[in-house]
Amino acid sequence: MDPSEMPAVHHCPSDSATGGETRAPQGMELIPRRAVRRSPTCARCRNHGVTAHLKGHKRLCLFQACECHKCVLILERRRVMAAQVALRRQQEAQLKRHLTQGLMRGAAPPRAPSRVKKGVTQPGVHSGKENIAPQPQIPHHVVPLALTSPGKENSRGPLLLSRPPEALPLPWTPMPPGPWAPGHWLPPGLSMPTPVVCRLLCQEPAIPLHPFPGFDPGTTLRLPTHGPLPTCTGSHPILTAPLSGESQGPSTLPRTCSTLILQPCGTPDPLLLQPQAPGPSRLTWTSASSEWQLQREAAEALVGLKDSSQAPRLTPGPANPAWISLLHPCGPPAAAGGRGFQPVGPSLRPSPAPSVALHIGRLGSISLLS
């Protein structure tokens, strides 16, 4: 056999004789074998022991319709490989799409700082300039009233004006409960232009006060509980009387606060009565120089009231017409005319410690509260 014909015989698929391969030189056999191994061959033909190149062999394959066990396995493997290739291509397409969307989203953040500079900066974050002070954190319950943009006033920094909620004080003042008070709370006192107000607070037996010369009505007199009475210099005397039943004996009134109020007839509104805490006896007298006669007549009326405190009726003198009303803290008020007691309410019930109001003609009225 001619050696030049051996390559053609070797590449023929129908030729199965290998006797000429042993006769061929060893150097000439390596090159064709390497070329055959590199070229793809048909799998169906290879299962049946036939080596055929794939180029142009798909339509000419002799085992294309074979359904043997080996050919079925080859078909299944081809289907799996085709599905894997399709899945890999789909994943690559999705990955490319996600990458493009991520690039578009990543391009948006560089524009965010330009928008932040136009608005208000966040609290505690610097905008890049050293002369801007950090803004303090605002609580949720505080509402800012004014905000200055950092772009206009960078030297001063943002200014925050806040108004925290404040509790408004109630106009009611707590007072200790007393026998005359209806409750524990009383409304605040109203300011009234009363010309003469005299309050006598007693805890110990009452001190008899007698007129003495040299008293100035424009001054204030405070009397201690124990010791001699102070002396004052003035041109008008002062007349006072003890509040007890006896002239010099101990007081029969209970140990509560007593208030003596001198009120003119022209005052339409009554004074607000507030309880006072028990303390040392003191007398505060404030009046004008033109009303010293009113004080004198009031003291004389108290002297007459002391003598007739147990009597059912009190008749004033003809020269000084007056009316007296006894007011009980828990009972209805009663009033009397110029001739005597004429109760307006259903009944007149005096108590051991009543509140007495004395009206002195045109001069005014006196209220004694105990």
Curated annotation (Swiss-Prot):
Give the DNA-binding residues. Answer: 42-89
- Which GO annotations describe the biological process of this protein? cell differentiation; regulation of DNA-templated transcription; sex differentiation
Return the annotated region ranges for Disordered.
Answer: 1-27, 103-136
> Signal peptide span per the entry?
none
Q: Mind telling me which InterPro entries this protein's record contains?
A: DM_DNA-bd, DM_DNA-bd_sf, DMRT, DMRT-C1/C2_C
GO cellular component, as recorded: nucleus
Q: Which molecular-function annotations from GO does this UniProt entry contain? A: metal ion binding; sequence-specific DNA binding
Q: Which cellular compartments is it found in?
A: Nucleus
Keyword set for this entry? Differentiation, DNA-binding, Metal-binding, Nucleus, Sexual differentiation, Transcription, Transcription regulation, Zinc
What does this protein's UniProt record list under function? May be involved in sexual development.
Question: Its family?
Answer: Belongs to the DMRT family.
Protein name as annotated = Doublesex- and mab-3-related transcription factor C2
* Provenance organism: Bos taurus (Bovine)
